[in-house]
Each structure stands twice: as C-alpha cells, then as structure tokens.
C-alpha cells in the first residue's frame, strides 16, 4: 500500500532549533533519527523500527540521489539494515541541514536536471531557521529549476 508521505527540508545554522522543533512536534517514540551515513547507499536503517517520523540529520548530499529518491517516494520500500532489512512505514520525513536546499546535489543539478526535479518534487516544505529562533517558510518554486 502506498504511503501518504510529507517531506520537509529544515535548514539553518547549528543551534537554531531544527531538531528541537521536530521533537516538540512529535512523540519521541515515533521518531527515528538517522545520523550515520556510512552504510550501503549512504545510510543504514539499523535504528529504524517502523517509526512514523524519519529524520535525516545534518544532511549534505551523503545519500546517492537514486537511493534518496526511493527513500522519499510513496511506494512500498525495503530499507537497508545490518542484519535484517526494514520495511518503510514512515509518513513524515525531515531533512535537516546547515545549507539551503539548492546547495544539495550540485553535480546532479548540473548534469542530471530531470533527476534534480524529481528530488524537488518530493519535498513539500522548506523551512529556514534563523539565528533569532524564528522560522521562514519558503514557497515551492523558489529554487532553481523548481517550477511548482
């Protein structure tokens, strides 16, 4: 069965409250934080146990774009883990970073424009965390090659 998936990109300087905001919005037990990008396809889902919220922390294009497109897709998916792969059950994904969305996957933007567009289509919300603790919701279409 397909999942209704909401993907939110949060960015801003360290200490501005990106992760704190996620934990204030969701029950801790429903959150899986991914912080290790050393596995096959750039990530290991060893800590994932069907949580509803997936957080990709400190993201800087570590996951190959082909894998990332699958992780952010609505279709049924098996996630790579060390001993036993996991079934994706999450319906919310947060990608946190210190850099704006348009600075991710620079080579993909340059040489694989359709792939970059596919990535942008999967991101519904872009929120910037400012040093004063406030946030700015950016409109879709505010990024290069994003026409929506």
Regions found by a protein language model. Give the residues of each.
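P-loop NTPase catalytic core of nucleic-acid-dependent motor ATPases
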Residues: 1-44, 49, 127-128
């Amino acid at each position: 069965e397909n999942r209704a998936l909401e993907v939110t990109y949060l960015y801003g300087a360290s200490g501005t409250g990106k992760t704190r905001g996620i934990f204030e919005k969701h029950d801790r037990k429903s959150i899986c934080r991914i912080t290790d990008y050393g596995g096959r396809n750039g990530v290991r889902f060893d800590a994932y146990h069907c949580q509803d919220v997936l957080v990709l922390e400190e993201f800087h294009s570590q996951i190959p774009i082909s894998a990332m497109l699958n992780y952010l897709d609505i279709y049924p998916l098996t996630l790579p883990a060390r001993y036993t792969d996991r079934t994706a059950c999450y319906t919310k994904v947060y990608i946190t970073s210190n850099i704006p969305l348009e600075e991710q996957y620079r080579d993909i933007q340059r040489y694989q424009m359709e792939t970059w567009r596919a990535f942008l289509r999967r991101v519904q919300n872009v929120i910037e965390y400012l040093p004063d603790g406030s946030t700015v919701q950016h409109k879709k279409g505010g990024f290069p090659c994003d026409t929506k």
